[in-house]
Amino acid sequence: MPSIHPSIDNGITKGNPNFKGGKLYCHCPTRKVEVTLASNVAHNHACGCSKCWKPKGALFSVVGVVPKDAVSVTANGDKLHIIDESAAIQRNACKECGVHLFGRIVVDHPFKGLDFVHTELSPQKGWQEPQFAAFVSSIIEQGFKPSEMDAVREKFRKVGLQPYDVLSPALMDLIATYTAQKSGKLPSKL
């Protein structure tokens, strides 16, 4: 089976709940884009969607969220560009190496105010470990054989990650709550 993700293939390393953040770097040999995160990530997960940046040969990305106010570009920001300005998550990638450093939501959205980041781009240890796998079936859209999907889901379960074809139940509940509040079916403050 191809690599799920380098940080998952051989088991998951537990993060440090007291970890305070670190720096992310693009893959350029010189003039690396540097992004500083002033907090640990939350909801870190394997993602099979076709939009997320993935390491070479990996079927999934590993991506978590941090408050947007905890994200700052601290070196070579001139090398960043937004991959698709029409997407809900505006992925800021290095123009030279293509690595996505952070994704920001600027439209009205349940996750607005949170930035999506790939902690594998950090040399620091202690980031929250992946909590679940999302959009698992989406790897089929990228050419993965449907007949091999059971093995992918079993690999996730074997390392302790629940595979979902959407987000985790807690995140789906947040989206549904946001939608109900916007429509007036629930009060704006619960």
Swiss-Prot record:
Keywords: Lyase, Metal-binding, Zinc. Its EC number is 4.4.1.22. It catalyses: S-(hydroxymethyl)glutathione = glutathione + formaldehyde. GO terms for biological process: formaldehyde catabolic process. Pathway: One-carbon metabolism; formaldehyde degradation; formate from formaldehyde (glutathione route): step 1/3. It is an enzyme of class 4 (lyase). Binds 2 Zn(2+) ions per subunit. Zn(2+) 2 binds at C47, C49, C52. Pfam families: GFA. Residues 19-165 form the CENP-V/GFA domain. Catalyzes the condensation of formaldehyde and glutathione to S-hydroxymethylglutathione. Belongs to the Gfa family. HAMAP family: Formald_GSH. This is Putative glutathione-dependent formaldehyde-activating enzyme.
